[in-house]
A protein has these predicted regions:
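Iron-sulfur (Fe-S) cluster-binding segments and ferredoxin-like electron-carrier domains
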Residues: 57-83, 115-133, 367-381, 407-418
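Cofactor-cradling patches in redox/metallo enzymes
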Residues: 119, 200-290, 329-340, 350-438
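Iron-sulfur-cluster electron-transfer modules
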Residues: 16, 35-45, 78-283
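Extracytoplasmic substrate-binding proteins
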Residues: 134, 252-253, 283-285, 301-315
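C-terminal amphipathic alpha-helical segment
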Residues: 297, 305-344
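Ferredoxin-type iron-sulfur electron-transfer modules and their immediate structural context
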Residues: 1-103
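Short cysteine clusters
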Residues: 48-54, 58, 106-112, 116, ...
Length: 438
């Protein structure tokens, strides 16, 4: 079934469609294209040769080899290029179809740009489609709820301020049984770094906060975590196209670090949040660079290892493979440092084929996993190529330093019955490092 013929039931897409008049659609499109974009879209539309080279890059296209509607250029033709051709004169039903494609058939992983002979940035164009849809109120229900949470609480999981602090205190108390004297310092001024995480950690994965605190304690790090709203470094608004709220989130995050007078921000193992903090948020706020330096966990662990601050008792013996998160590898070039860290920790590393910047996306990124259950089957069908890639390694452990990648890979592993499991770098370091004898 071609992507235009498939209808995914989503209450917010339908509600937004019902409220979108032709006049409002045209006005919103023209306001965005003239006020925010300039000539960039027109240049891409005119330089794209419709050659189909991008089809070799897209996991959706490779997973549906007999259906040309899944190629990136076809998706552009059905969305942003259609918007430009029609000068924004589209009806509500057409916009609903465009919104569905933009939120289901592109993870904005940017693998395709490596294959395009003229460098058309398809991910940017699809994010522009989402921007238009967001201003029309045609955004999937589940991801819009996370954006609403950002607006109300400055985190994506509706975590209250007291719940956040309680989670940190709880993990500190738990860790003291294993690491006497350990602290999770709150609002410590002048520390070397502020450690920031995404909201799913206090909500679902509190053990990762425990592990990070243990690693920093054993490494002798001078660190802190903020207690006030702005602690969550994630950003679903970047994916919905609500750039105004994206800017507010990033400003709040950096202002916390500035108030604490830390030297830099160390971010947990999340890809999209890292990109939002070091790239998207800065540009939307018209900052030349981050007001406080930002380091991803991959790079920070690499530093600790090279400085001899992490000591392990043994290496992980079972064979592992490395998944390359799009936003830290294609987007930031941390492939070598990731491999240095994994090879330090693991005795037997089997590379995926392809790997590094050519690795396939997990199909969770770009906010697609956050669109929720209605979109899950499409996500699974659209990444058969990743399942094949994982299966071909012959291993049972996947090292993936990204939250969304864990969610996407775990879904793929279960759906295709691969018999594998995922690990964060922090999982491995905590498991293998020297610990005090209590």
């Amino acid at each position: 079934m071609g992507i235009e013929k498939r209808l995914i039931e989503d209450a917010n897409l339908t509600r937004g469609m019902q409220l979108a008049t032709p006049e409002r659609i045209t006005k919103v499109i023209r306001d965005v294209l003239k006020g925010e974009v300039g000539v960039r879209v027109k240049v891409y539309e005119q330089t794209c040769m419709r050659c189909g080279a991008c089809a070799k890059a897209c996991h959706f296209s490779l997973s549906h080899p007999d259906d040309a509607s899944y190629t990136p250029v076809a998706k552009l033709d059905k969305t942003i290029f259609k918007i430009v051709r029609e000068s924004g004169k589209l009806n509500a039903e057409q916009m609903r179809g465009i919104a569905q494609i933009a939120h289901t058939e592109c993870n904005m992983c940017r693998r395709c740009i490596h294959y395009c002979p003229v460098g058309v940035d398809i991910a940017y164009l699809m994010s522009l489609v989402r921007r238009i849809c967001n201003k029309l109120g045609i955004t999937p229900t589940f991801i819009q709820d996370t954006a609403n949470s950002h607006s109300a609480t400055f985190n994506q999981m509706w975590v209250r301020e007291d719940e956040w602090i309680d989670s940190l205190v709880w993990q500190e108390e738990e860790a003291r049984e294993e690491f006497p004297g350990i602290r999770i310092p709150l609002d410590k001024e002048g520390a070397d770094f502020m450690y920031s995480v995404i909201a799913p950690e206090p909500k679902f994965r509190t053990q990762l906060i425990y592990q990070a605190a243990a690693i920093f304690h054993q490494a002798g790090s001078d660190w802190t975590m903020p207690s006030r709203p702005g602690w969550d470094n994630s950003d679903m608004c970047m994916f919905t196209g609500d750039y105004e709220m994206m800017g507010r989130i990033k400003r709040a995050h950096f202002e916390l670090a500035q108030k604490l007078r830390v030297k830099r921000i160390v971010m947990g193992e999340c890809g999209h949040a890292f990109r939002s903090v070091y790239d998207q948020g800065n540009r939307w706020l018209a900052w030349k660079d981050s007001p406080v330096p930002v380091v991803h966990a991959i790079e920070f662990y690499w530093e600790l290892i090279n400085e001899g601050k992490i000591k392990i008792t043994h290496q992980f013996e079972d064979p592992v493979t490395i998944h390359d998160p799009c936003n830290t590898i294609r987007g930031r070039g941390l492939a070598d440092k990731l491999r240095d860290v994994v090879h330090f920790l693991c005795a037997n590393v089997v590379e995926m084929t392809p790997n590094r910047e050519h690795n396939f996306c997990c199909s969770a990124g770009g906010g697609i996993i956050n669109c929720g259950p209605p979109f899950k089957s499409v996500r699974m069908e659209g990444n058969r190529v990743k399942a094949d890639q994982l299966r071909n390694t012959g291993v049972h452990t996947v090292v993936a330093p990204c939250h969304n990648c864990h969610g996407g890979l775990e879904d793929i592993i279960k759906h295709y019955k691969l018999g594998m499991h995922t690990k964060f770098i922090g999982d491995l370091i905590y498991e293998l490092m020297e610990k005090p004898e209590v």
